C-alpha cells in the first residue's frame, strides 16, 4: 500500500466518522490549516428595510415665474378681490412637492382588487378602540348631529375613523404646496387637464378660506392632495359644508371633534343621505349562476332598482330588505369569490365622500363594528344585512 494511502487510512480510522465539530479535511483526509478552512458566516438577524422617506418639504421652483400660475393669480385677483402683489409674495414662498405628484399617480394595472385585504387594514383593533373612545367622548355632539341631519352616529364615526383614525393622521404636507403642485404640475394621466382644473379650484378655495378665517395659508397642513382636518375635507368642501358645531364662532376641523362631526353630517345630508330610509345602507346578497344580473353592475353611484327587478335578475338579499331602491355592489376578493351587496341611496351618499365601493363599505363596517363593540355585543365576521 502506498505510504500516502496508508497514512490516510490511519488518520481516518483514528478520527472516526465524525463529530460535527471536527476540523475540515482535504480529499486525502489531512486536516486543513485554519487559513484554508472555509469560514462559516454567522447568521445575521434580518434587517427590516426602512420605508422610503417622504419629502414633505419640497423645493422652490419659482412658481411665480410660471406663465399659467401668473394667469391664475390675475384671474383670482380680479374675481375675488385679492391684492395681486400679496399673491405674488405668497406664491414665491410655495414649494413644489414631488411626493404629492407621485402619490396621486394611479396604481399599476394588473393587481386584482381585494376587499378582504383592504377591510383588514381599515377595520382593525386600533381603529375600533379609538372609535369607542371617540364615540364616548363626543356622544352629545354625535346625538345632536344625528337628530339635526339624520345621519346615524355610527356612519359619522366610521368616516372619521377611516379618514384619520379620529385625528391621529391628518397629514403633514403644507396644503398650499401640495395643491399648487397638483394644480400646475399634475402627472401624465387620463383627464390630466380636468384634474389640474380641479386643483386650481381647490387652490382658490384655500386662499378664500384663509382670508375668511384669518389664517396664514402657509400654516395649513393636510394630506398630499390638500385634504384638511379630522374628516379630511378638501378646501372647497370646507367652504361649502363645514359647520361651527361647537358654537365657539370658528370652524376648526383639526382640533374640534364637534366641528368635524357636524361637518361630516352636513356633507352627507347635502349629498343625498335620507333619514327616512329604514334599515342599514347595505344588505348581503346572493346571485344566480346564470349571470342575468350582469347588466345591473356598474350603473353609476346611484340606487335605481326595485326588489322585484333584482329578484327577476337572480339577485336575492340574505335577509329581507325593505322596499327601497337599490344598486348592486360587487366587492372583489382577488382569487376568492366576489361579495355582492344591495346598497341603498344612503350607501351611495357615502360614495360622494370618496367614490369607491371599498371606501363606503369600510365606513359602514367600521361604524357597525365600533357600535357593537361599544355596546358589548358580539361582532360577526359578516354584516349580512347589518
Where do the language-model regions lie?
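Bacterial N-terminal signal peptides
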Residues: 9-16
Amino acid at each position: 500500500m502506498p505510504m500516502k494511502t496508508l497514512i490516510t487510512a490511519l488518520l481516518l480510522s483514528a478520527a472516526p466518522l465524525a463529530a460535527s465539530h471536527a476540523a475540515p479535511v482535504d480529499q486525502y483526509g489531512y486536516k486543513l490549516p485554519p487559513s484554508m478552512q472555509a469560514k462559516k458566516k454567522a447568521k445575521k438577524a434580518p434587517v427590516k428595510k426602512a420605508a422610503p422617506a417622504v419629502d414633505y418639504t419640497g423645493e422652490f421652483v419659482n412658481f411665480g415665474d410660471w406663465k399659467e400660475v401668473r394667469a391664475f393669480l390675475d384671474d383670482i385677483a380680479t374675481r375675488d378681490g385679492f391684492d395681486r402683489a400679496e399673491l405674488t409674495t405668497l406664491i414665491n414662498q410655495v414649494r413644489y412637492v414631488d411626493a404629492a405628484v407621485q402619490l396621486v399617480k394611479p396604481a399599476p394595472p394588473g393587481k386584482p382588487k381585494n376587499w378582504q385585504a383592504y377591510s383588514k387594514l381599515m377595520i382593525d383593533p386600533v381603529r375600533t378602540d379609538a372609535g369607542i373612545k371617540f364615540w364616548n367622548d363626543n356622544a352629545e355632539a354625535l346625538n345632536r348631529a344625528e337628530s339635526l341631519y339624520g345621519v346615524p352616529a355610527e356612519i359619522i364615526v366610521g368616516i372619521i375613523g377611516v379618514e384619520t383614525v379620529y385625528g391621529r393622521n391628518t397629514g403633514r404636507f403644507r396644503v398650499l404646496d401640495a395643491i399648487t403642485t397638483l394644480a400646475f404640475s399634475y402627472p401624465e394621466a387620463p383627464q390630466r387637464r380636468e384634474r389640474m382644473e380641479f386643483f386650481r379650484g381647490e387652490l382658490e378655495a384655500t386662499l378664500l378660506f384663509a382670508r375668511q378665517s384669518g389664517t396664514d395659508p402657509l400654516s395649513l397642513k393636510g394630506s398630499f392632495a390638500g385634504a384638511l382636518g379630522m374628516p379630511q375635507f378638501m378646501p372647497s368642501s370646507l367652504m361649502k359644508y363645514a359647520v361651527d358645531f361647537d358654537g365657539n364662532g370658528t370652524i376648526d376641523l383639526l382640533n374640534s371633534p364637534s366641528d368635524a362631526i357636524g361637518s361630516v353630517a352636513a356633507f352627507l345630508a347635502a349629498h343625498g343621505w335620507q333619514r327616512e330610509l329604514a334599515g342599514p345602507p347595505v344588505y348581503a346578497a346572493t346571485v344566480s349562476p346564470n349571470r342575468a344580473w350582469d347588466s345591473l353592475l356598474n350603473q353609476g353611484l346611484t340606487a335605481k332598482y326595485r326588489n322585484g327587478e333584482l329578484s327577476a335578475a337572480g339577485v336575492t338579499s340574505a335577509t329581507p330588505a325593505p322596499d327601497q331602491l337599490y344598486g348592486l355592489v360587487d366587492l372583489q376578493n382577488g382569487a376568492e369569490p366576489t361579495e355582492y351587496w344591495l346598497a341603498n341611496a344612503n350607501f351611495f351618499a357615502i360614495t360622494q365622500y370618496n367614490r369607491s365601493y371599498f371606501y363606503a363599505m369600510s365606513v359602514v363596517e367600521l361604524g357597525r363594528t365600533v357600535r357593537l363593540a361599544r355596546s358589548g355585543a358580539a361582532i360577526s365576521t359578516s354584516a349580512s344585512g347589518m
